Amino acid sequence: MEMKTLIAQIVDAAVRTAYPGVDAGINYEALLEVPPDSKLGDFAFPCFKLSKALRMGPPMIAQKLAAAIDRPEVCTAQPVNGYLNFFLNRGNFAKDTLQKVMAAPERWGSGNEGEGKTVVLDYSSINIAKRFHIGHLSTTMIGNSLCRIYGFLGWHTVSVNHLGDWGTQFGKMICAYKKWGNKEEVEKGGVDAMTALYVRFHEEAEKNPELENEGRAWFKKIEDGDPEALEIFNWFKDVTLKDASRVYDKLGVQFDYYTGESFYHDKTDRVVNELKEKGLLTESDGAQVVDLSDDNMPPCLILKSDGTTIYATRDLAAIFYRKDTFHFDKCLYVVAYQQDLHFRQVFRVVEKMGYPWAKDQLVHVAFGMVSYEGQSLSTRKGHVLYLDELLDRAVEKALAIIEEKSPNLENKEEVARQVGVGAVIYSDLQNSRIKDIDFWWDRALNFDGDTGPYVQYTYTRCCSVMRKAGEVTA
């Protein structure tokens, strides 16, 4: 039995003892809190929730309940300002916990609260034809961690990498490839070769503005399903994902689906038509928007003045596709807080369309922005740190330390990989999720103090103690 459940049962029994015949009709477990300071106890019950049913002030209720509790093997209860604070019997709690761990070490801490439920997690969302940089680290690792946690709690998880693969820039890239590229160079150089083509396009366009029209024409071909344009476009995606897979493999991250904006291009008509049918679209400077003034938000743009969709339209299409396909109970978007307004608008539009489930099931998991050594990330300005380079350097540093301190260690390369990559992941996840992160090499690769390597070292020492102790029975 979970400790919180047991404490709730103790509260229930105390109420029945102190106030015979009174049925408060309260879910005690749902009301139990964890105090902000451990000095106030391990759990706290707010007695004011009982005041109406018992016709008594919270302080008096807390005193009477504390007097009715006699479970020293589990906890002690103290009345404090209308709260009933519980202090666990640490010795028995530790013994009980260790017994549970030893009985099922791989499953300890798991649960079945998500049994029969599905959660879709949208995270990482790399851009096609661009290298994977540290700006993608937080969304990738937070999303992956949430995916594993939900799975451990019994949920069926669906992980989605919502690729940035739509826009006129892809027409420009195809135009550049047709003029100056060749397949061998792109296959060999990967994303770097595609980036070089894109840069050259803009350099040439400054001298020949007509190239911009050619780029737009190629993107129109993608939109219209032109076979040649689609073949090159899809090949660019394959090359990008091949490059990205090497980084994901290093991080231990996998996805169930790679479906980007292009996947939903032909699914936006349903959204637009339904908005029209329900009278939610209004015209604004030639564009079609959903008015959100009642929610103190600017209008949500659905169609531009030329009739084309934008990412909000495609996000709406993605929501309905995922609902119809996966029948989710929750859909999480692990995206930086800069997109907070966008998601509030999109989620509210779904509600206004008559789908009340959007309020509780659509969740934006926001996180802080990443800067690099005091400056904002900028690919154009060259101020960016690519993730594969970061991981390689972390592993190199770990290996150098191993060579210095434990030159005879077996599997040095594998240990260095685990320690180096672990240092990078931990340095990202240890931060408060919503706060901005300023990445510095020295901090990320510091192997002392509150770091990934220190946690791994502690685990290793614990394993060593267990081996020396020999067989231990529960």
State what each model feature region is.
Residues 1-2:
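N-terminal presequence-like segments and adjacent domain-start helices
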Residues 6, 16-19, 25-49, 53-474:
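NTP-dependent nucleotidyl-transfer catalytic core
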Residues 8-12:
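Non-catalytic accessory regions of SAM-dependent methyltransferases
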